[in-house]
From Swiss-Prot, chain A:
The keyword Ligase does not apply. The modification Phosphoserine is found at S3. It comes from Bos taurus. This is ATP synthase F(0) complex subunit f, mitochondrial. Belongs to the ATPase F chain family. PANTHER family: ATP SYNTHASE F CHAIN, MITOCHONDRIAL-RELATED, ATP SYNTHASE SUBUNIT F, MITOCHONDRIAL. The modification N6-acetyllysine is found at K16. InterPro entries: F1F0-ATPsyn_F_prd (IPR019344). Its main location: mitochondrion. It is found in: Mitochondrion; Mitochondrion inner membrane. Signal peptide: none annotated.
């Protein structure tokens, strides 16, 4: 059955697996497109966790936890040697 | 252990691209703005804190000095947030780099001094000679005062760098010592306790910013407004 909704307007979860490469290639990869993506992501997180009536510490802690995780990934190469082993 | 101790202070690069730019810009994400009268808890808390700090710091200045409020408040927020983020595990603190602190100290100090010299030339020059010095001492004292003036930006930068770097190094060292002593025991509890106390004291890195901005402030005050 051919798609009645054009590929361009579908959200990611509605795209069939076979259509995935063409969907990815069709995304807006211009600088303003990428900036728009970051902005949308930021506001999605902000409006869900911070900009609410009774915001809790979770909104901030999740950001800091992600920051710690990213820094760990960045310095994994140097930290590899610190694993618990019998012989270093 | 030798090479390991200082690897946390090298500038983070990823495939030759400067990752440090992203790390320096990251604290700005944590200070959202809101143009509402009643905003969410996060923004309200930050606005309250900022109002408290700005009132306490800028009240001693006259109207000309108070034009620097935005600059000084951004400075204290930046240094405070950067230092506190550096206390998280594995993170990189930009203020440990002397280049960055010099880049902050020298322009701000120079701006204050030059403003003072342009607007109140006589008063600024008079700072080089304290009141009531005996006449034979005058040449030597002028030289000493000039040296003390020019050492101000260096002192500002080196003070911040040295304090933050020393604190981080100590945490690394004592943490490593605790791990090593874990198998030998008894002293472990004592060392872990020392780490805890050291970390708490290091959280007065926030007091560090206070010192930074306050010193800068004193300099600005003396030169600009007298």
């Amino acid at each position: 059955m051919a798609s009645v909704v054009p590929l361009k307007e579908k959200k990611l979860l509605e795209v069939k697996l076979g259509e995935l490469p063409s969907w990815i290639l069709m995304r807006d990869f211009t600088p303003s497109g990428i900036a728009g993506a970051f902005q949308r992501g930021y506001y999605r997180y902000y409006n869900k966790y911070v900009n609410v009536k009774k915001g809790s510490i979770a909104g901030l802690s999740m950001v800091l936890a992600a920051y710690v995780f990213l820094n760990y990934c960045r310095s994994y190469k140097e930290l590899k040697h610190e694993r618990l082993r019998k012989y270093h | 252990m030798n090479e390991n101790l200082f690897t946390s202070f090298i500038t983070p690069m990823i495939l030759g691209l400067p990752l440090v730019t992203l790390i320096v810009l990251f604290p700005s994400l944590l200070f959202p703005t809101s143009n509402r009268l009643v905003s969410n808890r996060f923004v309200t808390l930050q606005q309250w804190m900022l109002q408290l700090v700005s009132k306490q710091m800028m009240s001693i200045h006259n109207s000309k000095g108070q034009t620097w409020t935005l600059m000084l408040m951004s400075l204290i927020l930046f240094i405070g947030s950067t230092n506190l983020l550096g206390l998280l595990p594995h993170s990189f603190t930009p203020t440990t780099q002397l280049s960055m602190n010099l880049g902050m100290a020298i322009p701000l100090w120079a701006g204050a001094v030059i403003t003072g010299f342009r607007n109140k030339t006589k008063a600024s020059l008079a700072h080089f000679l304290p009141q009531g010095t005996p006449t034979p001492l005058i040449p030597m004292l002028v030289i000493i005062e000039t040296i003390s003036l020019f050492i101000q930006p260096m002192a500002l930068a080196v003070r911040l760098t040295a304090n933050i770097t020393a604190g981080h190094l100590l945490i690394h060292l004592i943490g490593g010592a605790t791990l090593a002593l874990m198998s030998i025991s008894t002293t472990t509890a004592l060392i872990t306790f020392t780490i805890l106390i050291l970390l708490t004291i290091l959280e007065f890195a926030v007091a560090m910013i206070q010192a930074y901005v306050f010193t800068l402030l004193v300099s600005l005050y003396l030169h600009d407004n007298t």
